[in-house]
Amino acid sequence: MENVIIIGSGPAGYTAALYTSRADLEPLMFEGELSKDLTPGGQLMTTTEVENYPGYPEGVTGPEMMADFKKQAERFGTRIFSQTVTKVDLSVRPFKVWSGDDVWEAEAIIVATGADAKYLGLESEEKFMNRGVSACATCDGGLPRFRN
């Protein structure tokens, strides 16, 4: 029986891991498996440069930042499994989580599965990605665009 299971390994998942592990709750995180649609570490794994996050005065790549988050969570005792959760039962306690053939029970589950960028499906979107087309207005809004 687990105290806490965290589903997801983006910034929210690692923040949850940090707080719960520091509270001696010994969290178990399912970071997911690398596949066409899923990337452990969340959307930041595809971000080339992060300049708007405290603690990185020179900027950092998304993968470097997520590696730091993972290292810090593991330092405090978070156990991280590279498996994808396929089913969750929240109807009765203890809660149940399925991953492959394994079933896990937990007193609490934190779902931190993030978000996906939504595109219009236009042919030109891919062509102009990061050159005028963006999935993050707050991230990319301050960057100079459309220079000659």
Segments from the language model and where they lie:
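N-terminal Rossmann-like dinucleotide/flavin-binding domain of flavoprotein oxidoreductases
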Residues: P40, M45-V103
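Alpha-helix N-cap/loop-to-helix initiation residues
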Residues: G13, G59-G62, K118, G142-L143
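Short N-terminal binding/cap micro-motifs at the start of the first secondary-structure element
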Residues: G13-T15, K36-T39
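Gly/Ala-rich phosphate-binding loop of Rossmann-like dinucleotide-binding domains
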Residues: A17, S21
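Glycine-rich Rossmann-fold phosphate-binding loop(s) that bind the pyrophosphate
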Residues: G8-A12
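FAD-binding core/adjacent interface of flavoenzyme oxidoreductases
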Residues: M1-I7, R22-A23, L28-S35, I80-R147
